[in-house]
């Protein structure tokens, strides 16, 4: 079984790519002002629901939340557009989650650097 990719994994990858394209190129919501990426999509086995993790790159927390809320409010439009490009019997209901793992990683890296610099003195 080594090297085999499950149908669900393949669809998750397609969903991830297509959701980004739909938000960026088709919907063009003027409220999406910050740079973002779809970091992960996790669809249920029956494709009834999918968790969509969004990472938003912004130092302004208000703009970040406004961008996330704009993406989240377009969930039904995104699902409709997704149904046009994905070859699957059903397209999952999309649930968006803010992914702060990049920011957490940056904070940890800064902490480690500060610790290392403190050890040198």
Residue ranges, per PLM feature:
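Charge-rich, low-complexity N-terminal segments
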Residues: 1-49, 55-121
């Amino acid at each position: 079984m080594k090297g085999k990719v499950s149908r669900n994994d393949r669809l998750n990858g397609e969903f991830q790519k297509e959701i980004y394209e739909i938000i960026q190129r088709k919907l063009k919501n003027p409220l999406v002002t910050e740079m973002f990426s779809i970091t992960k999509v996790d669809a249920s086995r029956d494709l009834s629901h999918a968790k969509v993790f969004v990472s938003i790159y912004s130092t302004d927390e208000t703009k970040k939340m406004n961008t996330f809320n704009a993406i989240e409010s377009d969930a039904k439009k995104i699902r409709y557009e997704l149904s046009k490009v994905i070859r699957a019997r059903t397209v999952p209901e999309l649930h968006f989650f803010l992914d702060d793992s990049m920011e957490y990683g940056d904070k940890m890296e800064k902490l480690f650097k500060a610790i290392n610099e403190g050890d040198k003195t």
